[in-house]
């Protein structure tokens, strides 16, 4: 679609580190830009506003901001938030799973990843441990694993462990500290862990352009964490195992691979028209 108006960058793309309700929208550069953006938006005709809305949809996990503020179909909080954490699908459902593809008639194509490699930008950047500095509001993270484990500590109110996680750049130690979180409830964690990984990876990839471009370049291929040891986030098999190419033979659930595919879908939707914006 070729726009008929000069376009202004939507706030969630202008400030990719900001969450929906951050104080950053109420002070400083975020507040100033938001007022500037909405003043500009109100100068558009209804037809132009509809055109802009089609070009730049809100991120799916911004549930209380919509182009039409008086909509009656605002998401129910109990469906889209859990312990204050936004989820992407109603009640935190998974968009993809092994069942999605296991009986597919199409020839499936895979992208395997596992260990990080800070020296290159290739499939290793899909690892939770890959160095990939990004921010979420006022917090800066070394990698997606740090975000995940820090959110785990926050969820259960363990400020001491949260601080330790945020003070290290060693992903292995982050994971170990995450296992020490006090007041841990596995049932609560199971309800929200997938959404935490979705959120963290959205911020990671939207703030690291080379990595984002690589993620988008995988098209509709199935992303696979080929960890022979992880049967939850990975497939429990190495990439060289012939069973890795047969989803029915996977020993694990591949939650990380499927989460990254969902992140890929969302980034593709939200950023599909950024080339139309002024540099």
Model regions: which residues?
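Charged, low-complexity intrinsically disordered segments
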Residues: 2-279
């Amino acid at each position: 679609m070729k726009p008929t108006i000069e376009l202004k960058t939507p706030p969630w793309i202008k400030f990719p580190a900001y969450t929906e309700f951050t104080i950053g929208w109420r002070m400083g550069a975020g507040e100033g830009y938001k007022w500037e953006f909405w003043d500009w938006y109100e100068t558009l005709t209804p037809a132009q506003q509809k055109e802009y809305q089609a070009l730049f949809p809100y991120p799916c996990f911004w549930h209380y901001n919509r182009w039409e503020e008086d909509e009656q179909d605002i998401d129910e909080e109990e469906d889209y938030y859990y312990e204050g954490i936004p989820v992407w699908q109603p009640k935190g459902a998974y968009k993809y799973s092994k069942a999605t593809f296991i009986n597919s008639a199409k020839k499936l194509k895979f992208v395997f990843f596992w260990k990080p490699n800070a020296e290159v930008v290739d499939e290793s950047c899909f690892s939770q441990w890959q160095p990939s500095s990004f921010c979420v509001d006022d917090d800066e993270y070394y990698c997606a694993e740090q975000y995940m484990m820090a959110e785990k500590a926050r969820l259960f109110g363990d400020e001491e462990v949260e601080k330790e996680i945020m003070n290290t750049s060693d992903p292995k130690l982050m994971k170990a500290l995450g296992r020490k979180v006090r007041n841990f409830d596995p049932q609560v964690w199971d309800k929200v862990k997938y959404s935490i990984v979705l959120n963290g990876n959205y911020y990671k990839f939207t703030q690291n352009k080379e990595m984002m471009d690589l993620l988008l370049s995988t098209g509709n291929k199935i992303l696979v964490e080929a960890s022979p040891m992880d049967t939850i986030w990975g497939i429990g098999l190495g990439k060289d195992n012939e069973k890795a190419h047969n989803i029915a033979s996977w020993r694990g659930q591949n939650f990380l691979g499927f989460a990254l595919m969902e992140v890929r879908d969302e980034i593709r939707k939200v950023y599909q028209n950024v080339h139309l914006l002024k540099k």
